[in-house]
Structures are given as C-alpha cells and as structure tokens.
Amino acid sequence: ELEITDAIQDLIDHGLTVNPHIVAGWWKDTGKLEDLLEANRLILETFTEQIEGDVDEKSSIEGKVVIEPGAIIRNSVVRGPAVIGNKARIEQAYIGPFTAIMNDVQIQGSEIEHSIVLEGAVITDVASRIVDSLIGKNVRIYRQPMKPSAYRFMLGDNSEVGIRW
C-alpha cells in the first residue's frame, strides 16, 4: 500500500517541483476501506436525482439517485444516495444507500449497500446482502451451488473476508 507521501517523494526523486497548497473543503485520506467508503458517502450526499438510463416500471427508484445513460434497471430497487454508471445492468437486485456502481457492472439477483463496485464487476445470485465493501475491476462474485455447502476463495495478498452466520 502506498501513501500520498510516497507519491510526493517519487515526484521529488524525478526532479519535479512539489508545492504546498491549502485545500478548501474537506479532505479524506482514503488509504483504508472505511475512509474510502466515508469519502464515497460524502460525495454521494452532494448528488441530485438524475435518471438518464432505462428503468422499467417494475423498478423503484428512491431518494437521490443518478442513473447514467446506457444503464439498465430491471425489476429492482435503487435507494439513494447512489449512482449507477454507464452501461451498468441491474436486474432483480437491491442497490442500497451510499452505493456507487461504476460503468459496465452487472448485478443480478443480489443485494448491496454502502459499497463501491468498480468497472466490469459481475455480482450474480449472492444469497446475503453485500455491505461495506469495495469490489475491484472485473471481479466476479457468484453463488455456485455445491454440496456439501462450502466457501471457495481466490484472494490476493493482504485480503480480508468476513463471513457471518
């Protein structure tokens, strides 16, 4: 994990000039998941409703929700503040408050809230609600019926998984 001081030092090491500036407004160090989710919450709270995607009559949009052009919402509930990115597809799903769904994400038969889902991720038929999570680019999360019941993981270095029952 790199910190902002590492980036500043790298600029100096490459002979570039680094100058200080006072930042107006809030500042959040997003080096930890909790801080990243808090920054996401603060940003989403500033949004106003903007529905430009395709939402069917079986879906419910509540609160400050941004649905970008090309997004498709089918038989789902989206409760804001939330953003659904371009070309995202949400089907038979619940998208709860403080959730940012980026471009080209697919969520089907699953529930998620207070989370960030990056580009190209696919979440399919997850049995429990996903909360307080950061889902990386092109990640696939799906339920795979296996007997006996089991969890199967492929996790990168320094990963963390919390399982409740």
Which residue stretches match the model-derived regions?
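Left-handed beta-helix
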Residues: 1-165
